[in-house]
């Protein structure tokens, strides 16, 4: 039995938010102790040429990244390699500090291997996070910033919040992710429309040459997903992340009707949305898949469906801190088994080809 499996019962008796704060503390402490930190990097970080990719002129050592929400305040970046991550996303960051929603705001659904969170973009604000990133940037791994509007900012002024964030962070991160799909900020998902996306990307593209991605909700109708995928690319999005958390509480029989569900129950819908988006924009912009990825097999399934990169978070809670390394090592074996010499050969191989109009 692994050490993680031995301590899991104790971890699950701890408040989810407190447990996360303890992980944050451990990550920040570990990097100051090479005798502990270096063996973790050696055990978990997979650096194999089969998984190397160059995307947006950035070097990715492996495809598995830190999902937004894990490192909200950019306090754990130094520790990413110790968990095996090849890149990551900090935040969500807002212009002004905000405490987020009232506690409790995180719940485990252990029998479903899921987490429900209603944090509400709690973060220290862009000024503090910018100072923190200045000390480490450029980092050995690509760093993205997940950016969102403050809760108190009205929808009609949302673009201004995103402009502030890009201006402040453009010299300390490698790319941006526009978050308009979190269920935890009232009215935020209403911004997932063509008019706002056009206005937003039109403004942000004038501020930076760095890639700007958009993250989709899994709760949109398929037709809207198709339309927004195409429109996002036309508006200038450099990539699409699918998906954010879901508000389908029936997936975990939750009596708590707030926040978003992540983890294994989201896997099927996240995969479906990936297939829809890939069917529309694969080859035009890179697609990142997140939601319920907890094994090499699931990761490989997403890659074959069109994902160039992947993200995990909840899997660490249920599978342990070695899961990213396991996924990457497993991916190499699966690629070899199918006769591939590089991950790029497998990306999108299962995307159905559209029937050509023979008229």
Curated annotation (Swiss-Prot):
Biological or metabolic pathway of the protein: Pyrimidine metabolism; UMP biosynthesis via de novo pathway; orotate from (S)-dihydroorotate (quinone route): step 1/1
Binding annotation for FMN: 68-72, 92, 146, 179, 215, 243, 263, 292, 313-314
Active site feature: 182 (nucleophile)
UniProtKB keywords: Cell membrane, Flavoprotein, FMN, Membrane, Oxidoreductase, Pyrimidine biosynthesis
Record's cofactor remark: Binds 1 FMN per subunit.
A cellular-component GO term for this protein: cytoplasm
EC number(s) reported in the record: 1.3.5.2
GO MF entries: dihydroorotate dehydrogenase (quinone) activity
CDD domains: DHOD_2_like (cd04738)
Classification via SUPFAM superfamilies: FMN-linked oxidoreductases (SSF51395)
Cofactor requirement: FMN
Chain sites annotated for binding substrate: 72, 117-121, 179, 184, 244-245
Pfam entry (one): DHO_dh
GO biological process: 'de novo' pyrimidine nucleobase biosynthetic process; 'de novo' UMP biosynthetic process
Subcellular localization: Cell membrane
PANTHER family per the UniProt record, alphabetical: DIHYDROOROTATE DEHYDROGENASE (QUINONE), MITOCHONDRIAL (PTHR48109:SF4), DIHYDROOROTATE DEHYDROGENASE (QUINONE), MITOCHONDRIAL-RELATED (PTHR48109)
Role played: Catalyzes the conversion of dihydroorotate to orotate with quinone as electron acceptor.
Record-linked NCBIfam families: PRK05286.2-5, pyrD_sub2
Assigned protein family: Belongs to the dihydroorotate dehydrogenase family. Type 2 subfamily.
Protein name (database record): Dihydroorotate dehydrogenase (quinone)
Source organism of the structure: Nautilia profundicola (strain ATCC BAA-1463 / DSM 18972 / AmH)
